[in-house]
Amino acid sequence: MTTSLANFIASLTAGALVLSAIGIALIIISKNDRVQRS
């Protein structure tokens, strides 16, 4: 595996981790935030 390919895969993995972390946080917040919307 070349260095550039390793860096590319690492950046993809990091991006996926960040996106999943944000998504999980939003889901938790939306579940806990029981604001009455008219």
UniProtKB/Swiss-Prot annotation:
Recorded GO cellular component terms are: chloroplast thylakoid membrane; photosystem II
**Keyword set includes Transmembrane helix:** yes
Localization, UniProt: Plastid, Chloroplast thylakoid membrane
Which Pfam families has this protein been placed in?
Answer: PsbX
Q: Where are the transmembrane segments?
A: 9-29
Top-rank taxon, per record: Eukaryota
Choose any GO biological process term that the UniProt entry carries and state it: photosynthesis
Q: What is its main location?
A: plastid
Topology of the protein relative to the lipid bilayer: Single-pass membrane protein
Quaternary structure and interacting proteins, as annotated: PSII is composed of 1 copy each of membrane proteins PsbA, PsbB, PsbC, PsbD, PsbE, PsbF, PsbH, PsbI, PsbJ, PsbK, PsbL, PsbM, PsbT, PsbX, PsbY, PsbZ, Psb30/Ycf12, at least 3 peripheral proteins of the oxygen-evolving complex and a large number of cofactors. It forms dimeric complexes.
What biological function has been recorded for the protein in this entry? Involved in the binding and/or turnover of quinones at the Q(B) site of photosystem II (PSII). PSII is a light-driven water plastoquinone oxidoreductase, using light energy to abstract electrons from H(2)O, generating a proton gradient subsequently used for ATP formation.
Q: Which family does it belong to?
A: Belongs to the PsbX family. Type 1 subfamily.
Q: What is this protein called?
A: Photosystem II reaction center protein X
Q: Which organism is it from?
A: Thalassiosira pseudonana (Marine diatom)
